[in-house]
Amino acid sequence: MLEYAHFDGRAISLTKGPREATGADLNEQLRLRAAGEIPRHIAVIMDGNGRWAKQRGLPRIAGHQEGVESVRDIVESCGQLGVQFLTLYAFSTENWKRPKDEVSLLMRLLLTALRDETDRLHTNNVRLRTIGDVRALPSELQNELREACTRTGSNAGLTLTLALSYSGRWELTEA
């Protein structure tokens, strides 16, 4: 469960917590909405999963798997709060420089997550989009992304954008 901490006009703090939402949490959400403090767009740079795992004596992939769980929580929380757009910077062009076995594991993890989560996204009215050089990804992953985006394309709730094989340079060349 992610807990909403505070939005000060520049940044929002989301932290992972062990408890379920309480009546006080729901009242706080209503207060924030009424005050206009819910941001329209939140962007998350997904970083630190490997360090998280290393600090716990776990393999790097365990950190990435925990990252998938965190993404599920973030998407759910943003949808509940009424955030309109969520962008996840999930795999930059720099990530291609990681060891090949780690990149392969990350691609498989993303493929599995898409297969497991697309129905949930659709049910929760989330529209999935991608930005970045998706053609650089493995063809099986490209196909799954295309199918997930098509399946959720007419949803009108939260728009979830995955930035994959993405960089500022890519954005400039594609503008």
Give the positions of each predicted feature:
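Flexible, compositionally biased loop and terminal segments
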Residues: L2-A175
